[in-house]
């Protein structure tokens, strides 16, 4: 005899082929009918996603109160407990915690509910980094439907083991209809699902009309009620928690549930890049406000941060973040994110000026600049700042030059091209190398002088050679590519690095039935200056050269598209920044950057709260802010703030930048994918920018180095009116292998989240408000601590 748990649900995408308003409106209709059926039939309705309940609470409060009564009666089960069902590959570990926290807090407050089973039926794959997050957010089990069985061979039920050793029970359902049943056909589909289980097994059947809400029909409920009464095997209306309480998996799985719909790792880069920008703005602003608050200078606007968290969580919805929604969903989601960024910038500004205003007034002729370091350790950094000179120089023979001082000592600096283009010398942009304190603001002072106007010498010869105490880089003027990068005597590249390559692709943003992105590669070639955005420009040219950096730009074209690659090589710093400005005019084509390495190293990349290894077989993988090839305890690393799709084949590393897919073009059997007799807009048309950093770094420092790259220190010319009583340092972390994921103020104290980016146990000294604490970590362990003003307490559950 087998027992089948019937979990009735109504999967409802707030956004997909439709926009938020339609999805949320459908939630009212679905929840109304569900509440009526709960009163009429003896069954349990399961639903998750607090964003939908919030919408009901606001727009139909009477229905909301009736739902609360059904929850109390056990007829309506709060399932999952997250804000919504996000993409489960691309959010950072910290973003996952916020996604879960929003739902957890809402359901606890409104329904006194704390689900133990997390549910992401429709997400397109699941990172192994989730396991520790699930466990430490109070979950013991997880149910999902993807990757589909034809995409990945998995046991139906297993123990999922995380990088730190955390374990949760998982069911990956294998039914062809995933999480729902066809309208009026639930009985037959439940019989089919039950038949896949053997005698003695505990099984699950997900049923109910879904994808656009809908519920089971009255006919479905009547027939399922009769089926339960007549079945020889127990069929019970149930919840995920009741199902997992009776399930004991017999196997373990220690990897990510990937690949799955690999086109989603790159499609709709506008959303992906906006998410990266927003999550880092949120976490950086929280740190700044916590620093200011502990100095008694500012208390954050909690409402602004909560709205920003919700905008971030909304952007993560699996049909938005993955780039598979219609164009209206892209537009409205970007609008939500920009609103959140504006809220956060207001908070950032208030805290920043409160801190900087305490500093000593400037001397006559000085231009003070303040730089905020969000990292919890002191470091040297190259920063860039613009400021305005009171009096312009309008001359072809004379110009301003600057000297920069920190603590009375002159530091290296260089004037570079400002962002504006008014043809006189008044707006100045400078690059300088300075010392930054742990989680705090540094001050430098600029002084002006005049000098005869200088011009860069024309670029000549077949190659451009940059050399300093750490590295030697060669850029060919015949190819425009980085042909060599020697670091401390060791060659990193095998030639031709950062070449743009175009591939044949298709209109499907999901990438159904694909393992690789693109076929039949065609290299971009140097522009001849005859047409396009780089018309009449030298195709490989030095555009900046001074005491801080040398910058070279190269111009390429292929098909109807153009790419500018810039190499910004910093003197006596271990890294080089590469930027790709893309003018993309292709449909059903893909764009990648190619980086051939000079050695055979293990392919690694960042995942939520950790890193993972990948095969070098050319198949598309998803990684976060770094990928690279491991070389012993060092890694040839490519950091980024712009994409999630990568692959490696042999010793060649590829970053996938763009696909020319159509909006929401989902394959339906063997039917044609898109209408051939009209213009169909492609998602990625127009100008895009992608930023990378190339460096050869110790493995344990990759996480912090990635944060340094993505969170460029904010700097501003500002004249303070204080008396020199600057804010005191409040936080520092000694071990470079330990990173600070979050530091924020909440009611009655402060939350700190720290990550051990190491496969071995680790320790660090942490100094907080003058008190020293010794913290011990297991492998890849993440700790959440609470500071109440006097003691630091580790939290068992994060939310």
Question: Where in the sequence are the language-model features?
Answer:
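N-terminal catalytic cores of secreted or lumenal carbohydrate-active enzymes
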Residues: 1-94, 98-99, 107-109, 136-139, ...
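The substrate-binding groove and active-site-proximal loops of carbohydrate-active enzymes
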Residues: 10-26, 48-57, 81-97, 113-125, ...
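Catalytic grooves of carbohydrate-active enzymes
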Residues: 11-17, 22, 167-357, 370-376, ...
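Alpha-helical scaffolding within the catalytic cores
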Residues: 29-33, 58-73, 99-102, 146-164, ...
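Alpha-helical scaffold elements lining the catalytic groove of polysaccharide deacetylases
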Residues: 88-109, 174-196, 525, 550
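CE4/NodB-like, metal-dependent polysaccharide N-deacetylase domain
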Residues: 96-129, 133-136, 190-206
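Catalytic domains of cell-wall/extracellular-matrix polysaccharide-remodeling enzymes
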Residues: 111-154, 214-223
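C-terminal (or distal) subdomains of carbohydrate-active enzymes
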Residues: 130-133, 154-156, 183, 190-191, ...
